[in-house]
Amino acid sequence: MAAPKKTQKRMPRRREEFTYRGYKIDELKAMGLSELIPLMPARARRKFNRGLNRGEETLLEKIRGGDEKIRTHLREMIVMPEMIGKSIEIYNGKEFLKVEFQPESVFHYLGEFALTRKRVTHGSAGIGATRGSKYVPLK
């Protein structure tokens, strides 16, 4: 007779807290723009050194103000740390796609999260589509 097996409780997986170049998200949110710029990738750093346009500034004001429904066409805007946890609707050329920002999306462009093209799914050929389909019996 075998001894009963001991069942071990499985510990839930602990997700490591996200850091960006050694800084936690809370630390990034507390930093000013002048402190964030050296941490950004080169393309984003160049954009912020040139300055934000009026539309980008108003988008940041809406986010800081706590508006619940934010819609934007600004696909070239960069995800700032204060956008983390917020949901923004981004226009993809046809419709607004709702995007919830995770910590991993810091300093990416908004346009990366609302794709403008769909994958093509071709259907089967219909009646009259090809010469061979002329002889398909109709139901």
Swiss-Prot record:
Gene3D superfamilies registered for this protein in UniProt: 30s Ribosomal Protein S19, Chain A (3.30.860.10)
Any Gene Ontology CC annotation: cytosolic small ribosomal subunit
Transmembrane segments: none
Coiled-coil ranges per UniProt: none
Keywords noted in UniProt: Ribonucleoprotein, Ribosomal protein, RNA-binding, rRNA-binding
Molecular function, one GO term: rRNA binding
UniProt GO BP: ribosomal small subunit assembly; translation
Family statement drawn from the similarity comment of this UniProt entry: Belongs to the universal ribosomal protein uS19 family.
Record's function text: Protein S19 forms a complex with S13 that binds strongly to the 16S ribosomal RNA.
UniProt name for this protein: Small ribosomal subunit protein uS19
Native organism taxonomy: Archaea, Methanobacteriati, Methanobacteriota, Stenosarchaea group, Methanomicrobia
Gene: rps19
